[in-house]
Amino acid sequence: MKSFTKYTLYLLFAAFVVASCTKEAEVGILPVISGLENEYIATVNQTLELKPIVQEAPNATYSWLLNGVEESTRPTYIFKAPSVAGQHTLVFRASSSSGIAQKVISIEVGKFTPVSASVNVILPLERPAAFPETAEINWSVTKASSDLYRLGFSEADEPLFIAAKAGRYNVKAFAGDLEFEYLVLARAGETVQTPYISNVFDYLPAPGQFVNKLPQYAEGDTHEDMVAKTAANLVGGNPTMITLGGWGGYVTFGFDHTITNVSGKRDFRVLGNAFGANANPRPDAPFGGSCEPGIIMVAYDKNKNGKPDDDEWYEIKGSGNLTAENEAWYEMAVTNKNDVRTFRDYEMTYYRPVTEEKDKPGTINSPSNFATIHKYIRWTDNKGQEGYKIKNVFHNQTYYPAWVKDDKITYKGIRLADNGIDESGQGSYYVLYAFRYGYVDNYPNIHDNSAIDIDWAITKDGKPANLPGIDFVKVYNGVDKENGWLGEASTEVAGAHDLHMLGISIDTIKE
């Protein structure tokens, strides 16, 4: 009896194992299809060869259905686009003994030439081959997934397209009765882009009270060391401040992508530390406080060498780059006997100080006794002027860039009108008034007027530059102003960002 029971149990177990194996064989593993996109775009009369990869499907059979009609049973398929535009659905099926897998594909056919582009990368568009060489071609964007794009032109009149957002952009060329259309498919690139500064190329502040402190100089540091320290402060999303010192001091930096010049919008912002006065005694005064405007130069990487070249720079035409006469504070400055001239060809030379020994100790928080060396750093300019920069009681380090071996440094550029007024009349309350737009460290970072429109860029002869975008920025201090016990007006830079990548939309200023 026990032997019979044991034999019966053995048969039941064997039957279960066989049944399980049979069930697994019946179910199997479904075919796996790869190597096909969900969507394809083709121009009329174009052919597309589709080569799917089918796995886990020995002895499989295949079927291609175009718009519901079987067209082929081969493992590959050639789609022949018709001569008219339209939308098509293609289904690929792979069948095996274990089941059926399928891939549904959408194919758009149009009278255009599809081209792929990466977001925030300039795409040159070729002249249509069918157009006569003498034809005058007009280009326009006829349809766009987003407003964040630019269709511009090179100096050789080559069309250049760039999009700040992924999507589809239809770009048409017209010449008389002739038409040609590109469908630009902008996609995110393989590398992750950041809206912030990614590289610092150069740094040379002019003498000033924060020089050798922001960033901190250490004995033996070279120019390369100070550029690296500047990069450590400015690169990335958590920047810290650097100083440009007195007039002419500069920093040059870049981004890991081209910032798109979107029509009608501000495109980027360079951060400073400007703020408004909270106790200005002047009634109904225009905005002012600590406004130390830095002039902006921009460039895009024409030759794709990854660095700014001397022939690529364009001036951002701020509101006071030609004259300050339209600034709200201009008449106030004239009455105050400020030097309100604007020099577009200014040169200033600073000389290494002869001594760091104090004339007198000076007194902290004393507007009348702040100077420790009155004839500290000698300067001359190309307008026949000369004088000395004062050393104050608040900062004891040398104001001359300590890593510079030369005994003099010359800077060149635009010198803006003097925007600072002692509103106390006693040397105790200086207000530096803001220019209307177009500068760094001129308005608080949260204010729209701290944002920059690339369309403000001009050529050397003052014409609009019409840049498609920019890769590099240079900022230099645009004012030469001593403000009593506050010291010199010194542009500070505390980072920069691409407004479009951050989703910040600010309309431009139109005059």
Predicted regions and their residues:
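Exposed beta-strand face motif in extracellular beta-rich ectodomains
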Residues: 86-90, 165-171, 471
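Conserved structural position at the C-terminal beta-strand
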Residues: 94, 173-175
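Bacterial Sec-dependent N-terminal signal peptides
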Residues: 1-47, 51-53, 97-116, 181
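A domain-level signal for the mature, folded cores of soluble proteins
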Residues: 185-294, 312, 317-511
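A short beta-strand segment in extracellular, disulfide-stabilized domains
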Residues: 45-55, 123-138
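Acidic carboxylate motifs that coordinate Ca2+ or other divalent cations, activating on Asp/Glu
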Residues: 301, 305
